[in-house]
Curated annotation (Swiss-Prot):
Its EC number is 2.7.4.24. The gene is PPIP5K1. Substrate binds at K64, K65, R224, K225, K259, R273, S337, F338, V339, K340. Belongs to the histidine acid phosphatase family. VIP1 subfamily. Its main location: cytoplasm. This is Inositol hexakisphosphate and diphosphoinositol-pentakisphosphate kinase 1. PROSITE patterns: HIS_ACID_PHOSPHAT_1. It comes from Pongo abelii.
């Protein structure tokens, strides 16, 4: 490590020279000047010119470091300075010679590494007093993590929350450790798992991360890289008991660490690498070097780099950053370290060090030296500029994989122990309680055992009826011998007058009933090994979804999606609901997508965000809406009729005329008769299982996923009991469970050969195909109402991602519950996205969707956004959206019955166009062997030529034709194997470009009949390091097809990590079908806005009366959001927090902030509970093509910005004089800048109070003022509007700005206070405008011109040297414009914008101060 100490008050600077090695130590080395030849040097000597004075730079470090490649590269460049000579002290001299014998030097670069005698180096520096590049005394501190953390804390640099456990016999009070199952308490500080345990010595790299039992438990053990491993997963969950450690909070970082390399206080290079905690496998490129991804640092992170550099007095210094929740935390300081393999960095580093040394020492040597003007302006190293592709954003909504049957049991409990447990865990706050954690489930089990013991002693009384239920509760909780929150959960709901009375609506006054709890035990529903394989396969397939990827990522060619951006890990966001199977599916998907290895637990903890924490996948599923209750009642009524379906039943049950629904009703005919048959088949099934249990040969029979015959019988006999009620009527709600169970047994336990199972599957599927989709609404209106109720936050999230990704690329993966997938599809089908009578492609898509009977596991809805750079930024042609869909894994029904889609990205039949665009994806798919029938071509006609044709998909330009390199990631059956994409294009000629053109498998089309098994090919390609020639693929039928059994692939059974029991079959997944590929961004945005607005309008009307009575003076924060009371007390200046005043929440990546990292929303609607804590997420984009904001600069008043197409109004780093408007800063922290300038914070507070009231009175949409207000204080520049929402928002803008101006006029005394120029910014905040969103027109820009005074000098002072963060403003402009278009509080990860307009009024003045 290197430190810079300024000896005797000198400023720290550095110069380098290259010279003698070990053998030539006594003499001064000769400066190496590569540009001079030997003869020129000889001529110089012959002329006997007096030698120029030379500054000698000594390198004092271990040989391994001083002769390393980066050091050699930098020293060679340093020697190009005419007056610098470098000498390297040999290791022998350093270790064995006394310091008096060391050669003298004027400047010393010395740093500690293993075995280095730091004491001697310190003694040498005292003896010779050279100029030190890296301070030596501070290097003692860097070796102790406790000291590093102490110094960082003193400097106000953000750290993860931590506690030190010193096991020192002399100080026993510092060694208080209490370990629980899922947490540890260190000296009073509690750290719930996951947490990190670091040895106090910085030289000890054995860092352990402990995982919570809900994610599978165990720990990840990190160590210094050994070969290709940097960590290993261990099932051990107990912390180490010897040695001193630092315990700190685990930061969820999307699976990357950012390494920052500072050279002096003004230069920092950053790289991201895969976190060793993820799977422990080191990613290496073709040369065997660890793969790193360049990263852009934010202004805040550059400031952190400067602080670290100065605090530790190390000119050359490396440290580790964790980017989590929109913040950047320093977790390690490494001292002296160089970037590897970056020529740009070597040049910059040598230049900075040379200039530093010359600036410091040239005056002493009378060397004429003037620093080159550009020397200090070395640019921050940008990301690798790889050509920006047209694909801007991919949002995929994916259902979880294959799972065990879900089971549940309800029981009413009244025992005081259950009430005590309910109270203990805070159930009375909401009246509901969900218990999932192991210790909570253990408490339930303890109570159950106690009650059963009491019942044995004294049977009788009311509890007697529940003995069976208590027994079942006990057996389920004891089922696996250990608890994992992923398996089971207990929900309890409080009923003040008993469950029965509450449900039957009895009058509680008439009879006083005792309160009771309804206990619902849910178990099963675990992801099976097959489900895990499906998710991994799909992840691998997604990797190649984007054509044109020639990049080599971890040995896989053609990783298109990953090439969206070299820092793709920062853009990839994977959200999952809190269901264990959903989280595990998401982790397995991430594993496949990112080519990870090993256990799922570390991947789950690092990569998968729980979307329930922020409400993204929330829906109040437990309490059904009134509409759902009505629908369920009608559905049950229709299906209880013991008569064949008549025409009126078809009208009542299938008003949408869905093909699959009509087909199922035809199969059913008489619903009660079918239920009778189903019940008889279930009875027969349980009888067969009981017989099998009597058979001595079945004693040790293991079913799939470790199930036993007893458990299987329990599953079926419970359904048998519950399906037919005592009255003889059937419980229709059990039909999905019956289908679930029989599907599972036919697929996984077929070896039992149970008779009647196939018939039971056929009948239950027919019933389920009616019940499941119709539970989400029977008529179009009901379907839409229920759908939006389920997935409103999800819709807002999708809309927001689409709106923001024209700025940078993003990849979002959402893993929701089944209800969200059904609902989202309903929104697209019934919400009126397009008029199917006018659009032939959409009509075909709707026909296809209506023919799909089941949204099976791994169903995908994929939205892709493209940008055409050749189009005008404001035209509708600029941004283009495609909608794709796959119904998930193939069911067990016959192949022929599957509906045929339109193929993946179907193109028009204009051959000329096909020829000109040779790089298109379809052309990359090879022709099909002539003997293979084309299912899609036979069943779906080619689209006719003519005006109704959709436009061709925009395809990626900058790439060669046929450059696609794809290896199919699965093996599958011949007639329609696993393909990510299907296509109904006619076969085109095959291009002879090696394996690259053989994109069989993945995009394999219906045109191509199968896919080959990737693992073998990948291994082959990797070991032989070459592409397979086309000839080698001629006989791919014989070579590469894996025998398939009944459409199920067994390909992954041979993978040891997949944990297959026996040889279970993994169903293949239907390829993606394109629903539409000619949508404009404007169409989709308008559609989603309309749906959200309709829903919130309805809610607003429902609660309007309540709202008016509660708070008539305050209107909602924007026209379409559900009204709610806004409490805004006078703004208090907060206490100074530990965070430094300059701190702003940094992004998870500046380069690409499109994929929000943790969506939050402030929707007050109780149906979507969002976390109460304000998120600390915020995204900044430093490089932006965007329009800026009005910024007040001293002496210039308000600068007007013209609104022009792509014109950049000012550079991202415009001027150090302009204070950045950090509007996205969380309001917890905004007071800090104010405290920096105490003399003006008071007026600012006054004016905020004055401003907050008018800004709350934003009119509701119904009261929008229509007339244009023409006030002398406003300059309104109107841009032609295209859409209605724009007009509405401009009216809103005008209204707010009128009030702000009015306020300014009325409070002239306050306005004349020093802060007045700042408060006027509030008006502008409301009037930010949209940037570059294709067809969405830019908003009216309203400039509050009148009393704009200059910002006084002292206001600006704290912000000297900051760059204006244009990107952030542009993003917020986009975001706030969305708000004004009527999408209330879009849940917006990683970039908070103020929740209510009155909050904006309060925040902005403070922040600018």
């Amino acid at each position: 490590m290197w430190s810079l100490t300024a000896s005797e008050g000198e400023s720290t600077t550095a110069h380098f020279f290259l010279g003698a090695g070990d053998e030539g130590l006594g003499t001064r080395g000769i400066g190496m000047r590569p540009e001079e030849s030997d003869s020129e040097l000889l001529e110089d000597e012959e002329d006997e010119v007096p030698p120029e004075p030379q500054i000698i730079v000594g390198i004092c470090a271990m040989t391994k470091k001083s002769k390393s490649k980066p050091m050699t590269q930098i020293l060679e460049r340093l020697c190009r300075f005419d007056y610098l000579t470098v000498i390297i002290l040999g290791e022998d001299v350093i270790l064995n010679e006394p310091v008096e014998n060391w050669p003298s030097c004027h400047c010393l670069i010395s740093f500690h590494s293993k075995g280095f005698p730091l004491d001697k180096a310190v003694a040498y520096s005292k003896l010779r007093n050279p100029f030190l590049i890296n301070d030596l005394a501070m290097q003692y501190y860097i070796q102790d993590r406790r000291e590093v953390y102490r110094i960082l804390q003193e400097e106000g640099i953000d750290l993860p929350r931590y506690a030190v456990l010193n096991r020192d016999p002399a100080r026993p009070e510092e060694c208080n450790l209490i370990e629980g199952e899922d947490q540890v308490e260190v000296n009073g500080a509690v750290f719930p798992k996951p947490f990190v345990e670091k040895p106090v010595s910085a030289e000890d790299h054995n860092v352990y991360i402990y995982y919570p039992s809900s994610a599978g438990g165990g720990s990840q053990r990190l160590f210094r890289k050994i070969g290709s491993r940097s960590s290993v997963y261990s099932p051990e969950s107990i912390v180490r008991k010897t040695g001193s450690y630092i315990y700190e909070e685990f930061m969820p970082t999307d699976g990357t660490d950012v390494k920052v390399y500072a050279v002096g206080p003004d230069y920092a290079h950053a790289e991201a690498r895969k976190s060793p905690a993820l799977d422990g496998k080191v990613e290496r490129d073709s040369e065997g070097k660890e793969i790193r991804y360049p990263v852009m640092l934010t202004a805040m992170e550059k400031l952190v780099a400067r602080k670290v550099c100065v605090a530790f007095r190390q000119t050359v210094c490396g440290f580790d950053l964790l980017r989590a929740n929109g913040h950047s935390f320093v977790c390690d300081v490494n001292g002296f370290s160089f970037v590897k393999n970056s020529m740009k960095y070597y040049d910059d580093c040598a230049k900075i060090l040379g200039n530093t040394i010359m600036r410091e020492l040239a005056p002493q040597f009378q060397i004429p030296w003037s620093i080159p003007t550009e020397a200090e302006d070395i640019p921050i190293v940008p990301t690798t500029s790889g050509t920006m592709m047209e694909l801007r954003c991919v949002i995929a909504i994916i259902r979880h994989g294959d799972r065990t049957p879900k089971q549940k049991m309800k029981m009413e409990v009244k025992h005081p122990r259950f009430f005590a447990l309910f109270e203990k865990h805070g159930g009375y706050k909401t009246g509901k309680l969900k218990l999932k954690r192991p210790e909570q489930l253990q408490e339930v089990l303890d109570i159950t055992r106690l009650l059963l013991a009491e019942l044995e002693k004294e049977p009788g009384g009311e509890i007697e009826e529940k003995t069976g239920k208590l027994e079942q509760l006990k057996s389920v909780l004891e089922m696996y011998g250990h608890f994992s929150g992923i398996n089971r959960k207990v929900q309890s709901t409080y009923y003040p007058h008993g469950v029965k009375a509450s449900n039957e609506g009895q009058d509680p006054q008439r009879e006083t009933l005792a309160p009771s709890l309804l206990l619902v035990l849910k178990w099963g529903g675990e992801l099976t090994p097959a489900g895990r394989v499906q998710a991994e396969e799909l992840g691998r397939a997604f990797r190649c979804m984007y054509p044109g990827g020639q990049g080599d990522y971890a040995g896989f060619p053609g990783c298109g999606l990953l090439r969206l951006h070299s820092t793709f890990r920062h853009d990839l966001k994977i959200y999952a609901s809190d269901e264990g199977r959903v989280q595990m599916t998401a982790a397995a998907f991430a594993k496949g997508l990112l080519a990870l290895e090993g256990e799922l637990t570390p991947i789950l903890v690092q990569m998968v965000k729980s979307a329930n924490m922020n409400g993204l996948l929330d829906s109040d599923g437990d309490s059904l809406s009134s509409c759902q209750h009505r629908v369920k009642a009608r559905l049950h009524h229709i299906l209880q009729q013991d008569a064949p379906f008549g025409p009126e039943d078809y009208d009542e049950l299938a008003p949408t005329r869905s093909t699959s629904l009509l087909n199922s009703m035809t199969v059913i005919q008489n619903p009660v008769k079918v239920c009778d048959q189903v019940f008889a088949l279930i009875e027969n099934l349980t009888h067969q299982i009981r017989e099998r249990m009597q058979d001595p040969r079945s004693v040790d029979l293991q079913l799939y996923h470790s199930e036993t015959l007893e458990l299987m019988l329990q599953r079926w006999s419970k359904l048998e009991r519950d399906f037919r009620q005592k009255s003889g009527r059937y419980d229709i709600s059990k039909i999905p469970d019956i289908y679930d169970c029989v599907k599972y047994d036919v697929q996984h336990n077929g070896s039992l050969g149970l008779q009647g199972a196939a018939e039971l599957l056929r009948l239950s599927k027919a019933l389920a195909d009616v019940v499941i989709p119709q539970e989400y609404g029977i008529s179009r209106e009901e379907k839409l109402e229920i759908a939006v109720g389920f997935c409103l936050p999800l819709l807002r999230k999708i809309l927001l991602d689409l709106q923001r990704t024209h700025e940078d690329e993003s990849v979002n993966k959402l893993h929701p519950l089944e209800s969200h997938v059904h609902s989202l599809l309903s929104v697209f089908r019934y919400g009126g996205l397009l008029d199917e009578t006018q659009d032939a492609q959409w009509q075909r898509a709707l026909d296809y969707l209506s023919a799909i009977s089941e949204l099976n596991y791994m169903t995908q809805i994929v939205i892709m956004l493209y940008e055409d750079n050749t189009q005008d930024p404001l035209s509708e042609e600029r941004f283009h959206v495609e909608l794709h869909f796959s119904p998930g894994v193939k069911g067990v029904e016959e192949e022929g019955s599957a509906p045929a889609g339109c193929g993946f990205r179907p193109a028009s039949s204009e051959n000329e166009e096909m020829k000109t665009n040779e790089g298109s994806m379809e052309n990359l798919c090879p022709g099909k062997a002539s003997d293979e029938p084309d299912r899609a071509l036979q069943t779906s006609p080619q689209p006719p030529e003519g005006p109704g044709l959709p436009r061709r998909s925009p395809l990626i330009r900058n790439r060669k034709a046929g450059s696609m390199e794809v290896l199919s990631e699965t093996s599958s059956s011949r007639p329609g194997g696993y393909r990510l994409f299907s296509s109904s294009r006619p076969p085109t000629e095959m291009k002879q470009s090696g394996l690259g053109s053989q994109c069989t498998g993945l995009f394999s089309t219906t045109v191509l009949g199968g896919s080959f098994s990737a693992p073998n090919l990948q291994d082959y390609a990797r070991s032989h390091g070459k592409k397979l020639p086309p000839a080698s693929l001629k006989h791919r039928d014989e070579l590469l097809f894996v025998p398939a059994v009944k459409r199920f692939s067994v390909s992954f059974a041979k993978h040891p990590t997949n944990g297959f029991e026996g040889c279970s079959m993994v169903p293949t997944i239907y390829p993606l079908e394109t629903l539409h590929n000619a949508l404009s961004l404007h169409q989709v945005s308008e559609f989603l806005s309309r749906v959200c607005q309709r829903h919130t309008d309805a809610q607003a009307q429902a609660s309007a009366a309540l709202f008016d009575s509660m708070h008539s003076s305050q209107a909602s924060d924007n026209p379409f959001s559900p009204p709610r009371t806004l409490h805004s007390p006078p703004l208090q200046l907060q206490q100074r927090s530990e965070k430094p005043p300059w701190y702003s929440s940094g992004p998870s990546s500046t380069v690409s902030s499109a994929g929000p990292s943790s969506p939050t929303t402030v929707d007050g609607n109780s149906q979507f509970g969002f976390s109460d804590q304000p998120s600390l997420n915020s995204h900044v984009a430093e490089e932006h093509q965007g329009l800026g904001l009005l910024l007040e600069t001293p002496g210039s008043g308000a600068q007007e910005l013209s609104i022009e197409g792509e014109q950049e109004l000012f550079e991202p780093n415009q001027s150090p004089q302009v204070p950045p408007v950090e509007t996205s800063q969380p309001y917890e922290e905004v007071s800090q800048p104010c405290q920096e300038v105490p003399d003006i914070s008071q007026p600012c507070q006054d004016i905020s109070e004055a401003l907050s009231q008018p800004c709350q009175e934003v009119p509701d949409i119904s009261q929008q003022c229509q007339e244009n207000h023409d006030n002398g204080n406003h300059t309104c520049q109107e841009v032609p509007h295209i859409s209605q929402p724009c007009q509405k928002s401009s009216q809103l803008c005008q209204k707010v700005s009128e009030e702000v101006c009015q306020l300014c006029l009325e409070n002239s005394e306050e306005v004349s206070q020093p802060c007045q120029g700042v408060s006027v910014e509030v008006g502008k905040l409301v009037h930010k405008f949209h940037v570059g969103v294709g067809s969405l027109v830019q908003e009216t820009l309203v400039e509050v011109g009148s009393p704009a005074e200059e910002i006084p000098e002292e206001v600006i002072q704290p912000y000297q040297g900051f760059s204006v963060e244009v990107g952030r403003l542009a993003q917020e402009a986009s975001a706030i414009n969305l708000l004004s278009q009527g999408i209330p509080e879009i849940d917006k990860p990683s970039q908070e914008f103020p929740e209510e307009i009155d909050l904006q009024a309060q925040e902005v003045p403070e922040e600018i101060n």
